[in-house]
Design a protein with these regions (language model features):
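TPR/TPR-like alpha-solenoid signature
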Residues: 17, 24, 66, 99, ...
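Residue register of alpha-helical TPR repeats
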Residues: 20-21, 60-63, 103, 144, ...
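Residue signature of alpha-solenoid helical repeat architecture, marking inter-repeat boundaries
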Residues: 17, 59, 99, 140, ...
Length: 246
């Protein structure tokens, strides 16, 4: 499907953005199936088009670069992965503190970690953490960066730094859980009124709340939400299946 769409769009200059998107999605699809050669070919197609559309398509250019880097990481072509990231970073302003810069730093940290260059990996993860710490809506990415940083310090035998980053990552994990708990509790009644007690959104929120309370050690509260979750889960999934067949 993706190759056919790409061939059609390739011959229509006005549809370049669509061609690039089809190539990008096709590359992701092949990557999920572990067909990295086909994935790389399509991601490179997307990358070449997005490169011609800079700076308007900068976000897409970086996304395609990171996807390609991930593939090279899986196939242990680390030099190619780092080269792709370096090219993407050059497209960003000096001193950039955006989400895309954070993604580049995290991706580079991952490649360096695979190469057992733990100090260099830690430096990249630290920079990513510094970005995500103050970037709105990035609490989960901040947690992930701290966890990765902790692994680097652990591998280097930096006991004090490893202990500190472990505590920081756990503190951030609990902050994320509290935020998710608050959001789901606030939306629960609205989900029930809109979708009903066997609606997937309502049931999913019940499950999330129960899981968070259990993680926090609040067993009684977890059970209070787990019981209606279990009673509504089967019906919700059955309704979803029926809708998919309609």
């Amino acid at each position: 499907y993706y190759e056919l769409a790409a061939d059609i769009l390739r011959n229509n200059p006005a549809e370049q953005a669509k061609f690039a998107l089809e190539s990008y999605l096709g590359g992701l699809n092949y990557s999920i199936a572990a067909k990295y050669e086909a994935s790389n070919r399509m991601l490179n197609q997307a990358l070449s088009v997005y490169a011609q559309m800079l700076p308007d398509r900068l976000d897409k250019y970086v996304d395609a670069s990171i996807a390609l880097c991930r593939n090279y990481g899986f196939t242990k072509e680390y030099g190619k992965a780092l080269e792709i990231l370096a090219k993407a970073e050059k497209q960003l302003p000096t001193g950039d503190k955006s989400d895309k810069m954070g993604e580049i730093l995290r991706s580079r940290g991952s490649i360096l970690y695979r190469q057992k260059q733990y100090a260099e990996a830690a430096a990249n993860y630290q920079q990513a953490a510094d970005i995500y710490k103050v970037l709105p809506g990035s609490d989960v990415k901040y947690q992930n960066a701290l966890s990765s940083l902790n692994r680097c310090h652990t591998m280097m035998g930096n006991e004090t730094a490893a202990r500190q980053t472990e505590q920081d990552a756990e503190r951030q994990r609990m902050a994320v859980l509290n935020r998710l708990l608050k959001e789901n509790l606030e939306q629960l009644d609205a989900y029930r009124l809109q979708w009903g007690e066997d609606g997937l959104m309502y049931v999913s929120a019940l499950g999330t709340i129960a899981d968070i309370y259990y993680t926090q050690g609040q067993t009684d509260k977890a059970l209070a939400y787990m019981e209606p979750f279990l009673s509504g889960e089967t019906t919700a999934l059955r309704n979803l299946f029926r809708l998919s067949k309609a």
